[in-house]
Amino acid sequence: MANLNQPPSRVTPNLLHILNAFTDSSNSIVNTIVELNSNTINKYELITETGHLKLDRVGYSSLAYPFAYGCIPRTWDEDGDPLDIEIVGVTEPLIPGSIVEARIIGVMKFDDGGEVDDKVIAVLADDKRMDHISSFKDLGEHWLKETTYYLSLIHI
């Protein structure tokens, strides 16, 4: 019979604690651990102690995430979690748990019930279609309205 609740014989390194936040600080490029992809309704969250992904919330509506979502290693926001990052303009699915390089184009300030919960806005660093985007304002008024509306309905 299997022995349950035994300590692991090997330990997987927690990428949240060993990866650098910036890969190229002069160009605002950061490592990002992908938690969920755009067009999904389920919410996954990185467990900070282990670095594993956990299903945090099962989606119950047809309102899907309009962006890929993750966190930046070796950072902490005022809410005690790693800095959240939205990656916009992603056309192919990103694999949850994978690491991508993202170029920061801004920060949106949010208050989640009296708690600071800012969102870093970024594009994939190597996506040539996004080279002309230098600020999230370059994404247009509709993007800003869609994102603000979405985040007002879904607390992430």
Question: Where do the model's predicted regions map?
Answer:
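N- or domain-start disorder-to-order transition segments that initiate the globular core
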Residues: 2-53
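Residues immediately flanking
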Residues: 36, 74, 90
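Short, well-structured hydrophobic secondary-structure segments
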Residues: 53-81
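Compact, glycine-rich, soluble single-domain proteins
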Residues: 68-69, 79, 84-90, 94-95
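A structural-propensity feature for long, helix-poor, extended segments
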Residues: 95, 99-126
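Well-ordered alpha/beta subsegment
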Residues: 114-150
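Conserved small/polar residues in nucleotide/adenosyl-binding loops
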Residues: 154-156
